Amino acid sequence: IRDDDVSHIRHTSRIDDVVGDYVQLKNAGGGQKKGLCPFHDEKSPSFHVTPSKGFYHCFGCQTGGDVISFVMKIEHMSFTEAVERLADRMNYQLTYDEGPTRTGGSDRKRLLEANRLAALFYQEQLQQPGPAQVGREFLQSRGFDKAAAAKFGVGYAPDEWDALAKHLKGRGFTDAELELAGLTKEGQRGHIDRFRNRLVWPIHEISGDVVGFGARRLSESDTGPKYLNTPETPIYKKSALLYGLEMAKKEIAKKRQVVVVEGYTDVMAAHLAGIETAVATCGTAFGDEHIRILRRLLMDDDAFRGEVIF
């Protein structure tokens, strides 16, 4: 990311607005605001924000910095990810000096919105009478009730060629956008849904945005793979994603422990059993990028203090 873009983000992102998304701030006088620190347990507010200087500081745990470092710390993001998050927040187009270009802010938002709406569509379909019953029965056979399915956003992809495509095109998305988002693919007579007659799990990046899906076949007559994932897209990079991480990140950082299990239902079962540090890979082997992501959650004062359990 170009230095002038970083400088622009740092100086135009109001730190009190950004912090205010996580902390209830109150005026503290002298141009400062204060609230309960999000980085340690406390009953009296010792977390201060100075909007005029763009800095925050906690007098309890001695953490502090600017708006970028705040997002890095609270969302467990890298520097680049934090800058990109803030750029998205203010709809600012970043430029890059070298390396692969990132999907433009407006394009990225369209892809994220398409996936968000797709997740809601699939969730609604799971509750419909008829063909979705096989999906509900599968979940019940694994010990998951309606509340569990809702907690993890599990859905059902209808056994139709273009049910999702029609739904999203009715909301203004184009065939090109839906294919780029990994939701449809080119068929013999136009674009068709990528997932059909499958149980679907939304896959989130660490920030919580839905970036793709994992889908399990429900019919023995389905000759496709047992599990099918969103293909690589501008927002879905399977080597850098862990299923359940957006739910587990706070507990992982707090307990200095992460439990890596095999699949989506294993993550569900673990969390419902109280093991809230469980995550799983998304149809790929556990690799270096996954380790890099988890190290950020398990680091304490630049030292690795935690355990990874398989």
Task: Kindly label every feature range from the protein language model.
Residues 13, 28, 103-122, 132, ...:
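Phosphate-handling DNA/RNA-contact segment within nucleic-acid enzymes
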Residues 307-310:
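Phosphate/diphosphate-binding loops
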Residues 1-102, 159:
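N-terminal structured subdomain of primase-like DNA metabolism proteins
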Residues 22, 114, 125, 132-143, ...:
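Periplasmic/cell-envelope proteins involved in peptidoglycan metabolism and beta-lactam response
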Residues 95, 103-104, 149-150, 154-156:
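Terminal amphipathic helices with adjacent charged low-complexity linkers/tails
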